[in-house]
Amino acid sequence: MKNGLEHNTKLTPEARDKQIADIDKRIDEMAASDPWMKFFLAYAPAPTMRRVKTPVLILTGAHDQQAVPQEVPLMEAAFKEGGNKDVTARVLPDLNHLFVQDTDGFPQNYAKLPPPIMVRADVLEIIVDWLTKRLK
């Protein structure tokens, strides 16, 4: 949510700052009332990534607002720092979190995407090729 607002060019800076402040307040309220949410918000995945020794495929869309592409190099580095020698990372152009063609990737706009809403064929090819090479 917050990332989507921070990159939303349709809002004025004042409106964006107010909505971000409102989200921070809501997140704090959720964390205070829900133990799982508190854990989720505090969880840092890098130590776990460093312990993974199996092959890893990291895929995200360039317009993903949920697993932002800027974090891909950090994830890749964490896996490799732990000694993982088989880490593949790709940021796929023009796609959102669902691997669907999307101009901005904001989840609130998913319902407005024109049909057919399908994972692009090249994404499936990347996954199949990656698996085929490792499951011989």
Where are these regions (language model features)?
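Accessory cap/linker subdomain of secreted extracellular hydrolases
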Residues: M1-R51
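Solvent-exposed, polar/charged alpha-helical surfaces in well-ordered, non-transmembrane soluble domains
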Residues: P47-R50, P73, A77, E125, ...
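Conserved beta-strand segments of alpha/beta enzyme cores
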Residues: D86-T88
